[in-house]
C-alpha cells in the first residue's frame, strides 16, 4: 500500500472513534 492509502484507512478508522468519544463526553456532561 502507498502512504496515501494507509493514511486514508487510518482516517476512516479514527474519525468514527473520535466522534464517538466526543459524543460520549458531551452526553456525560449533560
Swiss-Prot record:
Keywords linked to the UniProt accession: Membrane, Photosynthesis, Photosystem I, Thylakoid, Transmembrane, Transmembrane helix
Pfam families xref list: PsaM
Bilayer-spanning residue ranges: 6-26
Biological process per Gene Ontology, one example term: photosynthesis
Subcellular location: Cellular thylakoid membrane
Record flagged with keyword Repressor: no
GO cellular component: photosystem I; plasma membrane-derived thylakoid membrane
InterPro entries: PSI_PsaM, PSI_PsaM_sf
Membrane topology, as annotated: Single-pass membrane protein
Thylakoid keyword on record: yes
Main location: membrane
Family to which the UniProt record says this protein belongs: Belongs to the PsaM family.
HAMAP family registered for this protein in UniProt: PSI_PsaM
Protein name as it appears in the record: Photosystem I reaction center subunit XII
Organism per entry: Synechococcus sp. (strain JA-2-3B'a(2-13)) (Cyanobacteria bacterium Yellowstone B-Prime)
Amino acid at each position: 500500500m502507498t502512504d496515501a492509502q494507509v493514511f486514508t484507512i487510518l482516517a476512516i478508522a479514527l474519525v468514527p472513534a473520535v466522534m464517538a468519544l466526543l459524543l460520549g463526553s458531551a452526553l456525560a456532561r449533560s
